[in-house]
Amino acid sequence: MFCVLLLTGKAAAGWYQVENYEGSIGPNPVHLSLQRYDSFGSGITVEGSYFHDAKQSPIAVYGKISGTSVFLCEIADDREFDRVLVMGSKTPVGTIGCPFSLDLGESGATGTWSKGSDKFPITLKKVASLDDTGEAKVDGTVEIPFWAQTATHRFAGVYEKAGFLVCMNKLRVIDKKKKKVVQEIAFDDDDCDAGMLMTPIYMNVQKQVGRSFEIISVNFRGGSAGYSRDYVFSHRFKDYRLLVN
């Protein structure tokens, strides 16, 4: 599988370098989160997640960084998500024709989003960052917009520093229509392993949806290959509850 797992050793440095931005694409307020990594595969050196504040539906992005220049493509559907971000391409991916073109600065980014005849300016302010590739560093409130979502909810992980480590302290469940947090799931996690398993940080929460159930899986670093905890949505209580086997 293309999405390799993180090293589980406590002393080993990780590979999460994440920067979060707030701003606008044209007249529309947006949030953007980007993770840099040289070895995503297929020539990809940056992956991320962004959403329009009005819609609250995260869109996966991927692309390349060259100096301060960033070029990002959007994932259109589940099939492309699996092909590009899960399995990986046998040949290097290209970014020609992709909508995002950004120039990164110390405090933010500017650029354009263009698709067909539509073209909008982008203005972004850096609001938070996370880096565990060396000594763990967290600046600001780092909230990761995970790729997984349902028709009703999106999910955001709040990452904090705990001693020499960084991990997800809690998971926020956001109602898309109400645009507000409707539940917070805290983790009894003395080892600081929550949300630290998958190479793309945005894949540390995954979903399973059937006709009568919605389950989210939270990934944890630990052991030889990591593990996950499943939370099932209760239609009676209108929240996610830990699924106990």
Residue ranges and their predicted role:
Residues T8-A11:
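N-terminal signal peptide c-region/cleavage motif recognized by signal peptidases
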Residues G14-N245:
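Exposed acidic/polar residues on beta-strands and adjacent loops within beta-sheet cores, strongest
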